[in-house]
Amino acid sequence: TRGPGEKKLEMDRRLIKNRIAQLNRELREVKRHRELTREQRTKNRIPVVAIVGYTNAGKSTLLNTLTGAGVLQEDQLFATLDPTTRSRKLPSGQEILLTDTVGFIRKLPHHLIDAFKSTLEEAKYADLILHVVDASNPQMDEQMYVVYETLQRLEAMDKPVVTAFNKMDRIGESLTVRDFKADRIVQGSAKTGEGLE
């Protein structure tokens, strides 16, 4: 005979299974919507720039500074879960779209990459990768490696890369850095706007 604990366990399992099914349906819908949006952008020929970087590098702050987006800026893991895209006109008059992505972390488990795949895919389909690096972080080199390793796993390393060494206001001096994967390097501060011209 079954006791009340077993019935509760079965009910909890069913609720969890239903919730997982609902989330999978929602993820499929989000993926479908993003694919349609990407098709529309391609049709309109608006270049897309994916803002990528290690967690807390200042990606959302940079997006806000460049576009006035008002995206949540938090010093916490996975503060950005859903990519935000905003437009900006360049001095030449060309319109571009900037997309903020989830921050990368070291040893991100494969199942989490799968969970964030629809968010991280923005980098795969972008025309340019803007790699934001926290220049004040002592583990900057390791974090850069993690970002490139993740982009490689996403098959997104065939794009031009601009590396933006951010938070220069915290270190107060220019860096002598090398990024062999970058086509161009800039230094500045998303917080103060310095170096973003």
At which residue positions do the language-model features occur?
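Canonical P-loop GTPase G-domain recognition
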Residues: 157-162, 169-197
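Inter-motif core of Ras-like GTPase G domains
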Residues: 112-137, 149-156, 189
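Conserved nucleotide-binding/hydrolysis micro-motifs of P-loop NTPases
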Residues: 102-105, 135-139, 167-172, 190-194
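Conserved P-loop NTPase nucleotide-binding/switch module
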Residues: 138-151, 177-180
